[in-house]
Amino acid sequence: MKKLQLINLIVIISFLFISCESLKTATFDQHSYQKATEIKVMSSQLMDQATYPYNDYEKEVTNLLSELDKIVEYEKNKPYNDISLEMWKILSDKERNLLAGFLKRWKEQNKMSEVFVEQAKSQVIEAIDLIINYEANKSKESKD
């Protein structure tokens, strides 16, 4: 009977350990935070130019898309970082309506209306702010 109780206790402790492991969040990463703020500024400045011909800013667009690819690769290799990684993937997905999708449409249409740019920009900036805030809050969580 004591052996059965010990086995049950071990099983319960194992399940608790496994469930706690799945709730882990990556710790604060200064590089991730800094890159997110840099990408926010770059995105804001570049999106403001979308009322002009795409060809005039093709180099800057390529550079920004490269920065997105780099941060996705960086975030992919951090343990317990699924949420941040998914947020970056959504932002960099050319088939969605955030940053990479906006840049793709700019290339296809050559110029965007000022109204569209402002609306799209507010959504992109809000999405990047969510990433920045999530990363900043990791610092508080990891201290607890």
For each feature predicted by the language model, list its residue ranges.
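Long, amphipathic, charge-rich alpha-helical segments that form helical bundles/coiled-coils
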Residues: 68, 75-117
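C-terminal amphipathic alpha-helix
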Residues: 98-144
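Alpha-helical segments in soluble extracytoplasmic regions
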Residues: 48-86
